[in-house]
């Protein structure tokens, strides 16, 4: 019993940092309120109209991660949060967004993220480690854009360590990989579930996305 408890505790890391920097130290200290280039007092509300950056004037699906069809411009960026968020006044640095902490292993073969307890999807459910693993498994699966399999080629797998802790294992040491997996869009396991059964991802077409981003 004691040995099993010790083994379980050994799987969960001592926590690292609020940010991950490829070079040097993060510019912003833990607990910072906003990036320097952001106007924290900017008025809220109103309507924002964005012009598509593609030669597409319409859309026929809400799923931006599958091959067939066209989704609205910027949908992925506006509706789905990521584990880390890059700052625009630094090079190769990510700060915790869905994740409150990130730890890169000393041997470079894994990165572990602890999720914020207050992180919620648009349906009110908490963002859990199982959702992160589900998002990864779905994006590298046969029904998603093949570019994701290329992007995550050096990821060996994803482990759910506990409800709020997820670990990405790497095939070989690469200091950029924590930033790569930190940018994965996270969506709910409930997205595409119909009558209690999950549809194949390429059949999730007009189902309203269940993300945690600023827009829904």
Where are the regions a protein language model picked out?
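N-terminal lobe/hinge region of extracytoplasmic solute-binding protein
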Residues: 15-107, 137, 208-214
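Bacterial N-terminal signal peptides
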Residues: 2-10
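Alpha-helical secondary-structure segments
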Residues: 49, 128-135, 163-169, 213-214
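Sec-exported extracytoplasmic/periplasmic mature domains
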Residues: 37, 84-88, 107, 120, ...
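Surface-exposed binding/hinge segments that line
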Residues: 114, 150-195, 214
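Extracytoplasmic/secreted proteins, especially bacterial periplasmic and envelope-associated proteins
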Residues: 27, 78, 97, 127, ...
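N-terminal cofactor/phosphate-binding cores enriched in small/glycine residues
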Residues: 107, 111-113
């Amino acid at each position: 019993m004691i040995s099993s408890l010790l083994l379980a505790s050994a799987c969960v890391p001592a926590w690292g940092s609020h940010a991950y920097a490829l070079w040097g130290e993060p510019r912003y200290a833990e607990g910072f309120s906003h990036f320097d280039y952001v106007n924290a007092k900017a008025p809220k509300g109103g309507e924002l109209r964005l012009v598509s950056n593609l030669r597409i004037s319409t859309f026929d699906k809400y799923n931006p991660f599958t091959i067939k069809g066209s989704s609205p411009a910027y949908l992925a960026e506006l509706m789905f949060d990521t584990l880390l968020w890059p700052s625009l006044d630094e090079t190769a640095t990510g700060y915790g967004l869905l994740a409150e902490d990130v730890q890169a292993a000393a041997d470079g073969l894994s990165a572990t993220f602890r999720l914020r307890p207050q992180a919620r999807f648009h349906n009110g459910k908490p963002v859990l480690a199982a959702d992160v693993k589900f998002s990864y498994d779905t994006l590298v699966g046969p029904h998603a854009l093949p570019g994701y399999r290329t992007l995550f080629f050096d990821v060996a797998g994803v482990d759910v360590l506990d409800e709020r802790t997820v670990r990405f294992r790497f095939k070989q040491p690469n200091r950029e990989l924590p930033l790569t997996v930190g940018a994965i869009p996270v969506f709910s396991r409930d997205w595409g579930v119909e009558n209690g059964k999950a549809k194949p991802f390429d059949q999730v077409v007009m189902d309203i996305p269940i993300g945690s981003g600023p827009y829904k």
